[in-house]
């Protein structure tokens, strides 16, 4: 028995799908992966390096398609699980013949590229492509309510049906409420004053994550909250631009672009409020992590965020790109430590369905359904 996992980059597979690979490994499957270069995880028996390009319009994806089709033809997989937009398109195209011979193809949409508020032309194109490809998909998995509803709304037809799971899951043993002592220690280690009002948003510095909105919100709050501090762990192409914007807004001393961090579980202990300025998300795992530690949230009202944040209960949702609205809600939380605590406690409870063990249980049940389908197909030969 063989299973293939595909994604554009290795980091996606190693960051989110090791438990899924291990599920098959424990059941005697040979686990193969097809993605970009990187260190092969221990649970993978073979790694096929495929040069997927992030843009679907790059000619190099033709070579990626041919290489992937060859891998699928030669290995006769029982199950293929594809992730990330371009890799999932090419995988389903390359696996069409394999499906006729019994291969079960699973596709997880980590956020459709047609979404409420998307440019109309691009939404139409992506929706049309996804609808056509659904005919070449056995199981379609979504991670938020808007995407799940879109499947029936637009007439997608995956052979075995569609499912909604609570994302890839967050490790509750790692992300949990911290003691006051830990909070003090983390602040001291990171040079953060004890009385600072700390906001945090961990994300790549790019247009979609839209950290410029947060910088503008801080500029509106610096007089009302003179001890405000915005922590931005991450890296990306807009780092220099955001540094310039902070300087132009005269808020450099209130903002820290921290670079890539591997200690987010501890860094969250230093924060008072988790924020997100994203324009598009599949789910918003960074917010789940923050909520599990007991932080209230102020985030943009978009797909994914609306699944996680209960407006007025676990935090607040504001219109995308509306820095004044963001500032207003942050000021409200700043002025009421009691409200922050109350919302933070509710956030812990609201985030429980997104814990790793719960997300895995849902995904594993889908795998069992796929294995049953595989058995039935084999029996029908």
Where would I find each of the regions flagged by the language model?
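Aromatic "clamp/platform" in nucleotide-sugar-dependent glycosyltransferases that forms part
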Residues: 260, 279
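Short hydrophobic beta-strand element within catalytic cores of glycosyltransferases
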Residues: 296-299, 309
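Nucleotide-activated donor-binding/catalytic signature segment of Leloir-type glycosyltransferases, i.e.
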Residues: 243-259
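Conserved donor-binding/catalytic core segment of Leloir-type glycosyltransferases
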Residues: 193-209, 215-218
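Conserved acidic donor-binding segment of nucleotide-sugar-dependent glycosyltransferases
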Residues: 311-312, 316-323, 332-337
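A short helix/loop element that forms part of the nucleotide-sugar donor recognition site in Leloir-type
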Residues: 67, 176-192, 339
């Amino acid at each position: 028995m063989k299973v293939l996992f595909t994604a554009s980059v290795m980091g996606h597979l190693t960051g989110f799908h090791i438990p899924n690979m291990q599920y098959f490994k424990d059941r005697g499957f040979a686990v193969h992966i097809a993605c970009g270069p990187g260190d092969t995880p221990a649970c993978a028996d073979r790694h096929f390096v495929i040069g997927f390009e992030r843009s679907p319009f790059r000619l190099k994806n033709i070579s990626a398609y041919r290489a992937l089709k060859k891998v699928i033809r030669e290995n006769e997989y029982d199950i293929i699980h594809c992730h990330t937009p371009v890799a999932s398109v090419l995988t389903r195209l390359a696996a069409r013949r394999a499906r006729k011979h019994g291969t079960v193809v699973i596709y997880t949409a980590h956020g459709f590229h047609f979404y409420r508020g998307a440019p109309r032309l691009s939404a139409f194109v992506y929706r049309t492509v996804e609808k056509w490809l659904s005919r070449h998909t056995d199981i379609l998995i979504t991670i938020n309510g808007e995407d799940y509803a879109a499947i029936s709304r637009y007439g997608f037809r995956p052979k075995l049906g569609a499912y909604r799971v609570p994302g890839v899951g967050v490790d509750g043993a790692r992300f949990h409420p911290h003691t006051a002592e830990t909070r003090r220690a983390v602040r001291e280690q990171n040079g953060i004053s004890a009385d600072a009002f700390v906001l945090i948003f961990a994300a790549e510095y790019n247009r979609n994550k839209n950290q410029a909105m947060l910088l503008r919100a801080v500029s509106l709050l610096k007089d009302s909250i003179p001890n405000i501090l915005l922590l931005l762990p991450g890296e990306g192409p807009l780092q220099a631009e955001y540094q310039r914007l902070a300087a132009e807004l005269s808020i450099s001393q209130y903002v820290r672009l921290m670079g890539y961090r591997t200690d987010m579980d501890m860094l969250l202990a230093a924060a008072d409020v988790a924020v997100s300025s994203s324009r598009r998300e599949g789910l918003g795992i960074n917010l789940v992590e923050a909520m599990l530690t007991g932080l209230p949230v102020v985030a943009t009202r978009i797909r994914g965020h609306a699944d996680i944040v209960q407006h007025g209960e676990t935090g607040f949702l504001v219109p995308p790109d509306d820095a004044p609205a963001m500032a207003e809600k942050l000021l409200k939380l700043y002025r009421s430590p009691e409200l922050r605590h109350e919302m933070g406690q509710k956030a812990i409870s609201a985030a429980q369905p997104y814990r790793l063990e719960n997300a895995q249980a849902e995904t594993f049940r889908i795998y069992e359904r796929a294995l049953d389908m595989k058995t039935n197909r084999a029996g029908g030969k």
